[in-house]
Amino acid sequence: MKIALIGYGKMGHMIEQIALERGHEIVSIIDVDNIEDFDSPAFASADVAIEFTNPTAAFANYQRAFAHNVKVVSGSTGWIQDHKAEVERMCTEGGQTLFWASNFSIGVAIFSAVNRYLAKIMNGFPQYSVEMEEVHHIHKLDAPSGTAITLAEEIINDLDRKDKWVKGFQHAADGTESGSNEVAPNELPIASIRRDEVPGIHSISYDSEADKITITHDAHSRKGFALGAVLAAEYTKEHTGLLTTSDLFKF
């Protein structure tokens, strides 16, 4: 398969390594200093472009790739609030293909399934209050993380007593602290901590007077995310439309 990379930071380098190990060809690498290469024959020859950039660049990158009818796999977060409807329209009506996920880790896909199941169980146990915490490296710009938001939305869909998520306690990269996990009964607080070079930790806790249940996904490195992105690209080559991890992993 011919792959184009959009974004060549730590994730881009890791994706390149795994893609080559799996027998794929990298035909184009686009970063901030060569945006004009979107219009190159090499980019247009790609079966799939894998995009990991930042919230401000992602949507424009999708548009540039779609202009050449190149399918996109993206793990960029933070753009959905402003552009979700337009991206959905481009895929459902415009014939384009985007595989988007807030997290491509196989472990997170499994964790997500456990999260949904546990939320359904907790409908029968109203004495448990739920909250979430995510910890990431100091370079991560958005908070809460896209993965935390996805997990929170799953809980809201399956746990009747919660209907919205809100920012909880915040510990910024510069050490400043703000916010609180003390929220209204219908709200799910997400605490965000920026610390050192942590790849990503997501914890969901159900607390009662008697005990506390916590489930956690702790990423040891970016390798799991990169492998998942390449697996998603392999899937996307053979499929069309708006895709996500529930299409790739059937559980």
Could you describe each region identified by the protein language model?
Residues 32, 77-79, 103-104, 135-137:
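Short, ordered loop/turn segments at secondary-structure junctions
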